[in-house]
């Protein structure tokens, strides 16, 4: 099972998370988000992430210039698109930056299968999140059984995941590859090492001991 921890805003939190066996650390470049970081801030934070952990920049309906600025000025190796980006736009990114991974966030709504089929040939991974007009970051969960119809597609579950409900998700026997957490590993807006460690022990510990 993969783990992505997202919404980092401090070097201390990045350093603490980087000591754990996680797969990706995310930074948000979207001014309407409470966790928004400038490209300069992302450069500093992402530079503290070890080589073996993916460095993800979350953007919402960006233009190509924004993508270029992120990739030219930071160690980011994955772009997470969280808006209504077109296939043409994704292909533009891929053409210019062939080694960059593209993740597409989708809402867990009645159009989820249709949207997966639309994007699946063009992205490396999906994040399936709680439906929201604010493009994620709600801290709210959704009915995970909607994901039972999704097979043979690489995706992470996001949206209000925490150490209390993550076992419930795993009991559903879905085909997800892992989880993407932000508010579920926070206390008072900062990442909490105890919460992060608890999630790692549940997701990685159990799996590794099977």
Swiss-Prot record:
Q: Which NCBIfam families match?
A: PRK13958.1
Quote the InterPro entries the UniProt record gives.
Answer: Aldolase_TIM (IPR013785), PRAI_dom (IPR001240), RibuloseP-bd_barrel (IPR011060), TrpF_fam (IPR044643)
Report which superkingdom the organism of origin falls in: Bacteria
Q: Which Pfam families match?
A: PRAI
UniProt keyword Transmembrane helix present: no
Q: Which family does it belong to?
A: Belongs to the TrpF family.
Encoding gene, per UniProt annotation: trpF
Single Gene Ontology BP term? L-tryptophan biosynthetic process
Give the UniProt keywords, A-Z: Amino-acid biosynthesis, Aromatic amino acid biosynthesis, Isomerase, Tryptophan biosynthesis
Q: What is its EC number?
A: 5.3.1.24
Identify a single GO molecular function assigned to this protein: phosphoribosylanthranilate isomerase activity
- Originating species: Staphylococcus aureus (strain bovine RF122 / ET3-1)
Q: Write down the PANTHER family for this protein, in alphabetical order.
A: N-(5'-PHOSPHORIBOSYL)ANTHRANILATE ISOMERASE
Q: What is this protein called?
A: N-(5'-phosphoribosyl)anthranilate isomerase
Q: Which Gene3D superfamilies match?
A: Aldolase class I (3.20.20.70)
